[in-house]
């Protein structure tokens, strides 16, 4: 689980612009966020989700598991999911389930590392 203050994300984005986004997200993630009615809330939500995922994996952000090792995307119904671009990121037979929420002040995300097939 992770919670992010939207003001923190806003300050980083105001200071570094797209460079900030390119450091923590893939191009597809960036485009998804910038298309949203509240781009900062979407950016904060994905940031929180990425933090929650690395906590669930027990690794944190490292040289081996970095911001772009996986993407936080949405299925056609809008449900968030994790797509790994790094072979072996997840333990064999495991999947990750995520949930993201936000309000005017913060974004929160939860990630669960699940054994067994994806559902």
Swiss-Prot record:
Its EC number is 2.7.8.7. InterPro entries: 4-PPantetheinyl_Trfase_dom, 4-PPantetheinyl_Trfase_dom_sf, ACPS, Ppantetheine-prot_Trfase_dom. GO terms for molecular function: holo-[acyl-carrier-protein] synthase activity; magnesium ion binding. The keyword Magnesium applies. It catalyses: apo-[ACP] + CoA = holo-[ACP] + adenosine 3',5'-bisphosphate + H(+). One of its GO terms (cellular component) is cytoplasm. Mg(2+) binds at residues 2, 51. Its cofactor is Mg(2+). One of its GO terms (biological process) is fatty acid biosynthetic process. Keywords: Cytoplasm, Fatty acid biosynthesis, Fatty acid metabolism, Lipid biosynthesis, Lipid metabolism, Magnesium, Metal-binding, Transferase. It is an enzyme of class 2 (transferase). Signal peptide: none annotated. Coiled coil: none annotated. Belongs to the P-Pant transferase superfamily. AcpS family. Transfers the 4'-phosphopantetheine moiety from coenzyme A to a Ser of acyl-carrier-protein. This is Holo-[acyl-carrier-protein] synthase. It comes from Chlorobium luteolum (strain DSM 273 / BCRC 81028 / 2530) (Pelodictyon luteolum). The gene is acpS.
């Amino acid at each position: 689980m992770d919670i992010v203050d939207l003001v923190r994300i806003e300050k980083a984005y105001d200071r570094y612009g797209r460079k900030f986004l390119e450091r923590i997200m893939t191009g597809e993630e960036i485009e998804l966020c910038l298309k949203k009615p509240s781009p900062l809330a979407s950016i904060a939500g994905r940031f929180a989700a990425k933090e929650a995922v690395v906590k669930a994996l027990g690794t944190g952000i490292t040289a081996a598991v970095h911001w772009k090792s996986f993407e936080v995307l949405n299925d056609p119904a809008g449900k968030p999911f994790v797509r790994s671009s790094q072979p072996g990121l997840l333990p064999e037979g495991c999947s990750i389930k995520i949930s993201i929420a936000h309000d005017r002040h913060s974004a929160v995300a939860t990630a669960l590392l699940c054994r067994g097939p994806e559902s």
